Curated annotation (Swiss-Prot):
It is found in: Secreted. The keyword Secreted applies. One of its GO terms (cellular component) is extracellular region. Belongs to the gastrin/cholecystokinin family. It comes from Xenopus ruwenzoriensis. This is Caerulein precursor fragment-related peptide R1.
Amino acid sequence: GFGSVLGKALKIGANLL
């Protein structure tokens, strides 16, 4: 669901950092 999308975005953001 939406939470899964948020989790994915956070994972990608962490990778960028």
